[in-house]
Amino acid sequence: MQYRVDPKSGNRISALGLGCMRFPGAPGRPDAKTADAIISRAVEQGINYLDTAYLYPGNEACVGASLERLGLRDQVLLATKLPHASCKCAEDFDRFFDEQLRRLRTDHIDYYLMHNITSPAQWERVVALGIEDWIAHQKAAGRIRQIGFSYHGSAADFLTMLDAYDWDFCQIQYNYAGERYQAGTAGLMAAAERGLAVFVMEPLLGGRLAGKLPPRARAVFDDVRDPYLKTPAAWGLSWVWNHPQVTMLLSGMTDTAQVDENAALADRALPDSMTATQLDTIARVLGEFEKSNRVPCTGCGYCMPCPKGINIPGCFGAYNASYAHSWFTGLSQYFTASAVRTSEPKLVSNCIKCGKCARHCPQHIDIPERLDDVRRRFQPGPVTAAFKAFCKTRSS
């Protein structure tokens, strides 16, 4: 395993970190046996950084129990996040943090983040509640070792956040399709210049730069036949690791095979190691990808549940597939997401435009507006009637 140094703490952090949010299982109940297998294999492969959050249903408790069963807590750097938007008074900081320690079965958090900062105003609000004194107290007591924030706002606001506090690290979304999106390359460079460790999330854009890559984009990679970069995932992860400013990237690995594949890649993907030919290949793939990337949804599920039962990520995935593959492919996926698994169709036309989903979207997608695009593409009158007839027939 390749390790990179956190400039603030001196910690040697594996270039590949384990994002635990996507552990398989029922909603809110990650499968314990699978979690044990993934975490155990990750540590065997040299991964020493695990990321979870209060707002990932059931995830902190799953990770904590797994680390205790496996006896691995002392071998990893554990990261979780404060749901700052739910903090209404200073006492809430302790209330959430103490609950997180209990869930994770630990007496300290190695890397603690303000979760999903989208504007400096969010930080200013908790500063007014006294969070700076609270952080200082927790760090002095050894219960928080490093403090940082995860970010999903504009590039300009990211620079403001960097200077708003004496941060130890930050976590940004970064991939070859997002150099000018959110913090972007400019933000990565600015954070590194300030001496912060920079952790990367969504290096494969929720899988859209890996297994879900459009065929025409994948064909560019296939034609190159690189002896080391044999999959779209390998290309995407290597592109992120090619930046020396990146301390570590998180991958939401869902089985041990993914752990093995990504760990092997992390051994070779050194900073500034990609050739001009490889970087040109990435640029050509990006050109093809952007032709079909109509809605930048990563499938994170923060928008769910919808009060009308609409499968928002599934609908956006179908919409993009209709451009990446064919209209009929997209329609089939939309049918599966909206009708096959329900007793009555949960069509995008059911949207009441309450806006609840959009308020939670890290990508700042105007979800009600984009669902209208999905409706126009997939719901001409005969199709809508067919959906409803199918559900009625099945339930009778």
What are these regions (language model features)?
Residues 1-76:
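N-terminal binding-site loop/beta-alpha segment at the start of enzyme catalytic domains
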Residues 6, 18, 35, 42, ...:
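Conserved, mostly hydrophobic/aromatic
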Residues 19, 53-56, 112-115, 150, ...:
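Conserved residues at the C-terminal ends of beta-strands
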Residues 26-27, 40, 44, 87-204, ...:
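Glycine/proline-rich, positively charged
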Residues 47-48, 67, 166, 186-396:
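Structured C-terminal cap/extension of enzyme domains
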Residues 48-54, 145-149, 171-172, 248-250, ...:
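Short catalytic-loop micro-motif centered on adjacent basic/acidic residues
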Residues 61-80, 132-141, 193:
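Alpha-helix-loop-beta-strand connector modules within alpha/beta enzyme cores
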